[in-house]
Amino acid sequence: MALGVPGHGASRQDLASETPVTATAPSSAVSSRRFLLWLYLVGFLDLFGVSMVVPLLNLHVRSLGASPVVAGIVGSSYGVLQLFSSTFVGCWSDVVGRRSSLLVCILLSALGYLLLGMSTNVFLFTLARVPVGVFKHTLSISRALLSDLVTEKERPLVLGQFNTASGVGFILGPVVGGYLTELDGGFYVTAFICCSVFLLNAGLVWLLPWRETSLNIPDNGWSLDGKHTTEPIKSEGTLQGAATTSTARRSERTVQAPWVEVMLALKDMKNLIFSALWDVFLMRLLMGVAVMLYYSNFVLALEERFEVRPKTTGYLISYTSALGTLAGFAVGPILRLYKHNSYMVLLHSSVLTCLLLVVYSTTCSMAMVVFSSTLLSFSTTIGRTCITDLQLSVGGAQASGTVIGVGQSVTAVGRILAPLLSGVAQEISPCGPPSLGAALALVAILIMTLNRPPFSGDGSERLKQE
């Protein structure tokens, strides 16, 4: 596969590379596949480190003397920071390049977990959440990079495999974190290990075979040359079998200061985000909150409804997480069955999610809880992959970082709303949060039904906003 074109002059040799190395056509497919596998490892380590710490955060902040209300406010601060930072970080990654932005985000996230390992009071704990809340967009940037590397038809499969690799880390992390927390000062040890994992990830990103060629983006994508000008380069690369494009059309313009470029990118994206993409982001918000409500009181609800011990519930959560990881491998075959129509896959997975939330909310049998949780692990995994692919198809690959960043902002809004809605719903019944989630999923389904996108399933007639 050709990820771009060769360099066009000695003046471009000095600039730090922003794309993976590619060689001749016969060897480029192997080289590209290796690069993807390294990115999958980055995703695995990312969630492995995070999932060691996150389940222990509430327990630790309570042990520092915080009241439940203060602990809730501190916990919601992460979502607030993610909300206001994700769009800017996504835009910034489009401007400065994936490598630089990914390295900065990983290193500053490592700093946050290092501070967390030294937090002996609530103030230090809150301070430690700031760099993580602002810069923990490493998975989003990695997904944007993956979308740059592959064609639209291959993108759902590659994103599904990336989510699968990350999911394996999310399965193993809580087990390691739970074991370490039993030791003396176990939380601090876990936080320091998480910091070390992020530093290892930064080393992997630094050592990846990057070079200064364009990615698999349209011909209005921009790359920097050695004289700090930009030139649009058209690539016809695919993941396997495509020859390297030997010619490219070029024009030059002066690069503004980074913050000016970010503001210009935000201005250029404004009409697209709030016209062609409003329904896509609304669907993401509704389905995201629906699933968060399901998980928000899962342990407490099973204990109150079925007298299931938290340890047993933990096994069920690990079981469903493992199934969610396996579901990533099903994305490719399912999309082929649907002729790569991501929209219809998303619609049908959302319908299944809604029905399963209703079953979970109303059942009186623990066996039905296991059944609904099993299928939910598949439907939610497939839905997440398809909504990301739909965003990129409508928004365009030339602003993939910005589009994914806005999507993360929408998810951050969900992280703020879900705990509030869950608290109110739990005042009514332990079944309140998942019941409310089913209602929100139904609204999302109605929006999807009434606002079918005017483009084909393979994205060949992508919406554009001039």
Curated annotation (Swiss-Prot):
Key words of the record: Membrane, Transmembrane, Transmembrane helix, Transport
InterPro entries: MFS (IPR011701), MFS_dom (IPR020846), MFS_trans_sf (IPR036259), Tet-R_TetA/multi-R_MdtG-like (IPR001958)
GO CC terms, sorted: membrane
Coiled coil: none
GO molecular function, one term: transmembrane transporter activity
Record's subcellular location: Membrane
Topology class, membrane: Multi-pass membrane protein
Transmembrane segments: 35-55, 64-84, 105-125, 157-177, 187-207, 272-292, 315-335, 351-371, 428-448
Similarity field: Belongs to the major facilitator superfamily.
PANTHER family, per the entry: MAJOR FACILITATOR SUPERFAMILY DOMAIN-CONTAINING PROTEIN 10, MAJOR FACILITATOR SUPERFAMILY DOMAIN-CONTAINING PROTEIN 9
Name of the featured protein: Major facilitator superfamily domain-containing protein 9
Species, as recorded: Mus musculus
